Amino acid sequence: MLTFIGLGLFDEYDISLKGLEAVKEADLVYAEFYTSCLMGTNPEKMEKLYGKKVHLLSREDVEQHPDWLDNARDKKVAFLTGGDTMVSTTHVDLRLRAEKLGIETRLIHGASITSAVSGLTGLQNYRFGKSASIPYPYESRRGTKVISETPYDTIKQNSSFGLHTLVFLDIDKDKGFMSVNIALKLLLEVESKRGEGVMDRAVAVGIARAGSEKPVVKAGYAEDLKGFDFGKPLHILVVPGKLHFLEAEALVKLADGPEEIMENIE
């Protein structure tokens, strides 16, 4: 049996009671934190709460050589992930691999950043369009900096339908956790290059450390927000589309947004 367990958003205490019981009953416990991680804890704290050794897996262990799956043929194996366990396509692929090997699987869900963002900002979850991810720039063969324009295009498309865009920020082994500030600067660089009016007067909302006791939620114009101090990671970004009057009020009251956004409402 292979049980996928979502750990929630921030620390070891975000796990559900059902998830905690499954971990305690498991013969082996594995975890991966390269798709998402819990910034308020570490493996040692998890092991103390769970009473079990947590074996950390690399990207290669999960995606290329998941030999550890064989243990689930005749043992109870728990696989831990940040957030909700099936939001990442990596985990869907892993589940399908297990099923093809004849291994029974089950899911125990956890809190997801996609629902937490709606709760923290007041933006209605059914008004979100396609999400986007901003990677760090890379250097071309000619030595020039290459910035992905795909997130800009996604925001543009969603905005044309009045929809909000949830923007995931890169987690890089060498460069670390991308901040809201870097993400906005990259989007504004693309705006400067293309001049299509997507980001120059756009309202954005930055969220830091969702799930913690003191998350930061700040709304403002992208140009202004890029200088705001969001503090430690993890960060995530939202670029709202057309605002319902309750959403606009929430951004002003709950995210310290500018009063002018009350004018851009349905």
From Swiss-Prot:
<feature type="binding site">
    <location>
        <position position="210"/>
    </location>
    <ligand>
        <name>S-adenosyl-L-methionine</name>
    </ligand>
</feature>
<keyword id="KW-0808">Transferase</keyword>
<protein>
    <recommendedName>
        <fullName>Diphthine synthase</fullName>
        <ecNumber>2.1.1.98</ecNumber>
    </recommendedName>
</protein>
<feature type="binding site">
    <location>
        <begin position="112"/>
        <end position="113"/>
    </location>
    <ligand>
        <name>S-adenosyl-L-methionine</name>
    </ligand>
</feature>
<feature type="binding site">
    <location>
        <position position="87"/>
    </location>
    <ligand>
        <name>S-adenosyl-L-methionine</name>
    </ligand>
</feature>
<dbReference type="GO" id="GO:0017183">
    <property type="term" value="P:protein histidyl modification to diphthamide"/>
</dbReference>
<keyword id="KW-0489">Methyltransferase</keyword>
<dbReference type="InterPro" id="IPR000878">
    <property type="entry name" value="4pyrrol_Mease"/>
</dbReference>
<dbReference type="Pfam" id="PF00590">
    <property type="entry name" value="TP_methylase"/>
</dbReference>
<dbReference type="GO" id="GO:0004164">
    <property type="term" value="F:diphthine synthase activity"/>
</dbReference>
<feature type="binding site">
    <location>
        <position position="9"/>
    </location>
    <ligand>
        <name>S-adenosyl-L-methionine</name>
    </ligand>
</feature>
<dbReference type="InterPro" id="IPR035996">
    <property type="entry name" value="4pyrrol_Methylase_sf"/>
</dbReference>
<dbReference type="InterPro" id="IPR014776">
    <property type="entry name" value="4pyrrole_Mease_sub2"/>
</dbReference>
<comment type="subunit">
    <text>Homodimer.</text>
</comment>
<feature type="binding site">
    <location>
        <position position="235"/>
    </location>
    <ligand>
        <name>S-adenosyl-L-methionine</name>
    </ligand>
</feature>
<dbReference type="GO" id="GO:0032259">
    <property type="term" value="P:methylation"/>
</dbReference>
<keyword id="KW-0949">S-adenosyl-L-methionine</keyword>
<comment type="pathway">
    <text>Protein modification; peptidyl-diphthamide biosynthesis.</text>
</comment>
<comment type="similarity">
    <text>Belongs to the diphthine synthase family.</text>
</comment>
<dbReference type="InterPro" id="IPR004551">
    <property type="entry name" value="Dphthn_synthase"/>
</dbReference>
<dbReference type="InterPro" id="IPR014777">
    <property type="entry name" value="4pyrrole_Mease_sub1"/>
</dbReference>
<feature type="binding site">
    <location>
        <position position="169"/>
    </location>
    <ligand>
        <name>S-adenosyl-L-methionine</name>
    </ligand>
</feature>
<comment type="function">
    <text>S-adenosyl-L-methionine-dependent methyltransferase that catalyzes the trimethylation of the amino group of the modified target histidine residue in translation elongation factor 2 (EF-2), to form an intermediate called diphthine. The three successive methylation reactions represent the second step of diphthamide biosynthesis.</text>
</comment>
<feature type="binding site">
    <location>
        <position position="84"/>
    </location>
    <ligand>
        <name>S-adenosyl-L-methionine</name>
    </ligand>
</feature>
